Regions:
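Secondary-structure boundary elements
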Residues: 30-93
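Long, contiguous interaction/recruitment modules in multidomain scaffold/adaptor proteins
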Residues: 85-227, 241-253
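Canonical positions in the second alpha-helix
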Residues: 215-216, 249-250, 281-284, 317-318, ...
Length: 379
């Protein structure tokens, strides 16, 4: 079973061609909202009030850089929370006090610029991380931000020299020994736009997804990930020939990109070119015999067939190889509950809660656990 995949980052691969020939504006209606990456660092009135009030006071007490770092820390003034549920600009991240790593980096950079610090961005190589949303499967990248060296600021009545300090919203243990690569700010903006395209796709907003990914490509034509996203957008829109062109562009620069290969195989199958699609499927099976969500999809199929024991075994395989992904624990809990193994199901639900990274998932799993515990107490 082939799945539609989006990738978040390919920092080491640069596209060396003009993206406009791949675009097809006339095929799509106007977007339902403004599509603009130029203002993602803009401070809202609430952010400006924070800079001039609470942050000003903290900086005068602790210094420019240390004041901001402490405000952003886990137990700091802002009390930020990691939430993988969506990508936000600086203002929305500040308002919600939460966001994914890219959203939190954008907000941090906005504050740093406002108080006179320079910023530098890094793409960090982490172990492959996957998620799914709305029938779309995502390969998740990671970025962080470094607050600059030898920058002075008189705004707060200080003349201060600071050293580079990297702000990262993953636990230190998750980053130990990982390599990073400097990326320009235009890449951060393109990542934001590409993420918004993927989120629009997952929500069924194919038209808006096109305009988001178009903006990403024009913002940073060298960034490979949006070309793959564009292929998925075209396929969802029924523009199969355009989808093939976009995906073959990805493969021109990364011939063994598993996500683009999988997406292209789906497109070729849709076009009725089964021999070509099967050749790609054989190549994919050689590159990765059991790709991400391989056992998961089989587990869902077993549940639909009311074969709970088989579903349990498939979900257990996914938990064994990727125990930090919440959905595997949740669906294993479903299969176990269907089999009457309530204690084991409760244990898996607790693990789903512990590993969830989105507020909506956390609320769902907590409600399921409460219901399961209530049913147990009733009996």
């Amino acid at each position: 079973m082939l799945l539609p995949w989006l990738l978040a980052a390919c920092a080491s691969v640069e596209v060396r061609e003009e993206p406009r020939p791949l675009l097809s504006d006339a095929t799509f209606a106007a977007p339902s909202r403004p599509i603009d990456g130029d203002r993602i660092f803009d401070l809202s009135p609430a952010m400006r009030a924070y800079v001039e009030g609470d942050l000003d006071k903290r900086i005068k007490e602790r210094g420019i850089q240390k004041g901001l770092v402490e405000a952003l820390s886990e137990r700091g003034q802002l009390r930020l929370a990691y939430d993988s549920g969506g990508t936000r600009d600086a203002a929305d991240t500040f308002e919600g006090r939460s966001g994914n790593c890219l959203s939190l980096v954008i907000m941090t950079a906005a504050f740093a610029k406002a108080i006179g610090l320079t910023v530098r961005y890094q793409s960090v190589e982490i172990d492959e991380t996957w998620s799914r949303n709305g029938g779309i499967y995502f390969n998740i990248g990671h970025v962080n931000v470094t607050l600059g060296r030898s920058m002075t600021s008189l705004r707060f009545g200080q003349l201060e020299t600071v050293r580079d300090t990297t702000i990262d919203f993953l636990p230190p243990g998750d980053l130990r020994g990982q390599r990073s690569q400097d990326i320009p700010e235009r890449r951060i903006v393109a990542m934001y736009l590409n993420n918004r395209a993927g989120e629009a796709l997952a929500a069924g907003e194919v038209n808006d997804a096109y305009w988001w990914v178009r903006a990403a490509m024009l913002q940073d034509p060298g960034f490979l990930a949006p070309y793959n996203t564009l292929g998925v957008v075209y396929r969802r829109h029924g523009d199969l020939a355009l989808a093939e062109r976009a995906l073959r562009t990805v493969l021109k620069y990364q011939p063994e990109n598993r996500l683009a290969l999988s997406n292209l195989a789906i497109v070729l199958s849709d076009l009725g070119r089964r021999d070509e699609a099967q050749a790609l499927e054989v190549k994919l099976a050689r590159l990765d015999p059991t790709p991400p969500f391989y056992w998961f999809e089989r587990g869902l199929a077993a549940l639909r067939a009311h074969d709970n024991a088989r579903a349990r075994d498939f979900f257990q395989k996914e938990v064994d190889r990727a125990g930090d992904y919440h959905e595997f624990h949740f669906w294993l809990a479903v299969a176990l509950a269907n089999l009457g193994q309530i204690e084991d199901a409760r244990r898996q639900l607790k693990l789903a809660i512990e590993t969830s990274t989105a507020r909506s998932d956390l609320d769902l799993y907590s409600a399921k656990l409460s219901k399961l515990q209530g049913a147990t107490q009733t009996h």
